[in-house]
């Protein structure tokens, strides 16, 4: 089991390290806001560009495709670069993609620009978390990772509603321009606060690829792709569930999204705390909790006062993120950059798999709440992969 090599930054004061973590988290906030903002602006984009809302859905898919393609590709291409330089280049690419999206004249260029904006997503998070972990002692590495991921969860709670409000009252183009400005702010903060590390351990593209012949890496990625799908299965259909099952007005939907974001913040912190104490066993506890939450959700959906706590609990399932991310750093000796970036590609597979499975069931005539049962099945699938990973780990130690 390996850990990121201690960096020169470990000699920095706690205050300096906190500023670096805040700079890295700001990048996560920019990415999270850019990824989720369009979901609340689909009608605005459709009306402005003269296309249907399902066509705007393809814009979301283009971004996700960019993440899946860019995470491993850019991690490999940047393997020999200093991490500080790579972070700056990745965030510059993200800023460019969002400014271009804001200026897209028609639908087709917007598809291309969202794909470009998605390319640096996974690689940025992967490298940022390696930097954060390298500054922390072994028993606090998952907590450091969760601080970087906190930017993403705060984006769900604050950034997404802010961008949606800006897009509705001015133009959806201003929402993407705002994301670009936040990305430029991240570039400035990383350039100022993150020092160059001449002793940083470098990897090679061939070394990164060669390390991917180990089963623990693929099992960890599988746990993310399958185990996380349940959260996305339910969350993607939250609005129609509230309207048609809970039978509340559309004004409650932003409140529900904020409750979900609050759950994400709690879950993100809890995931890092658990993994620092339980290591791989934390993944099993999180997946078991996820299964329980998803099984309860269909029963909680019929009342506003029961579905809101259920939505909060759904958000806490994001605890799987920092736990799996840190586990990958442990098992991916020689391929930590590629593995950390690929973890976000796996999460985007979950983001596609969950809604697709839920959509199949709903299109077949089942109730909106069936998403909870389907999600529970995927969480159980993640537990099966955990059992396999646990067996492999015990056999090699």
Regions found by a protein language model. Give the residues of each.
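A late C-terminal transmembrane helix in Major Facilitator Superfamily
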Residues: 331-367, 374-375
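Helix-loop-helix hairpin linking two adjacent transmembrane segments in secondary transporters
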Residues: 107-109, 137-192, 241
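Helix-breaking motifs and short loop linkers at transmembrane-helix boundaries and internal kinks
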Residues: 50, 82, 103-109, 247, ...
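C-terminal transmembrane helical hairpin of 12-TM major facilitator-type secondary transporters
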Residues: 281-324
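Cytoplasmic helix-loop-helix junction between adjacent transmembrane helices
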Residues: 113-151
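Paired small-residue
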Residues: 93, 97-100, 108-117, 305-313
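Conserved MFS/SLC helix-loop-helix module at the cytosolic interface between two early adjacent transmembrane helices
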Residues: 69-108
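Helix-to-loop junctions at the C-terminal end of transmembrane segments
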Residues: 71-82, 267-279, 362-363
């Amino acid at each position: 089991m390996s850990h990121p090599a201690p960096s020169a930054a470990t000699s920095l004061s706690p205050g300096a390290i906190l500023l670096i973590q805040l700079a890295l988290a700001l990048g996560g906030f920019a990415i999270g806001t850019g990824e989720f903002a369009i979901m609340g602006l689909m009608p605005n984009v459709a009306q402005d560009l003269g296309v249907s809302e399902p066509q705007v859905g393809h814009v979301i898919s283009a971004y996700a495709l960019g993440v899946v393609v860019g995470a491993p590709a850019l991690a490999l291409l940047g393997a020999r670069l200093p991490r500080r330089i790579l972070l700056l280049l990745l965030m510059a690419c993200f800023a460019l993609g969002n400014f271009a999206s804001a200026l897209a004249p028609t639908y087709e260029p917007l598809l291309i620009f969202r794909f470009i904006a998605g390319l640096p997503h996974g690689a940025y998070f992967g490298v940022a978390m390696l930097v954060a972990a390298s500054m922390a002692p072994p028993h606090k590495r998952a907590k450091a990772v969760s601080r970087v991921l906190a930017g993403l969860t705060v984006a769900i709670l604050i950034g997404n509603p802010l961008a949606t409000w800006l897009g509705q009252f001015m133009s959806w183009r201003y929402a993407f321009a705002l994301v670009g400005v936040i990305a430029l702010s991240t570039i400035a903060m990383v350039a100022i606060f993150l020092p160059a590390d001449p002793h940083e351990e470098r990897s090679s593209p061939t070394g990164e690829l060669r390390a991917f012949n180990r089963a623990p890496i693929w099992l960890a990625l599988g746990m993310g792709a399958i185990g996380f799908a349940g959260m996305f299965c339910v969350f993607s259909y939250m609005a129609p569930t509230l309207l048609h099952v809970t039978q509340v007005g559309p004004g409650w939907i932003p409140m529900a999204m904020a409750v979900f974001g609050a759950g994400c913040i709690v879950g993100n912190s809890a995931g890092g705390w658990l993994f620092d104490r339980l290591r791989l066993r934390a993944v099993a506890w999180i997946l078991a909790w996820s299964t329980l939450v998803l099984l309860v959700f269909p029963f909680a959906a019929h009342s506003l006062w029961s579905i809101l706590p259920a939505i909060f609990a759904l958000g806490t399932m994001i605890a799987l993120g920092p736990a799996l991310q840190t586990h990958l750093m442990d098992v991916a000796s020689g391929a930590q950059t590629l593995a950390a970036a690929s973890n976000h590609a796996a999460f985007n597979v979950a983001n596609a798999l969950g809604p697709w499975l839920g959509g199949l069931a709903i299109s077949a005539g089942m109730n909106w709440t069936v998403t909870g049962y389907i999600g529970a099945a995927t969480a159980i699938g993640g537990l099966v992969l955990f059992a396999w990973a646990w067996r492999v780990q015990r056999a090699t130690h």
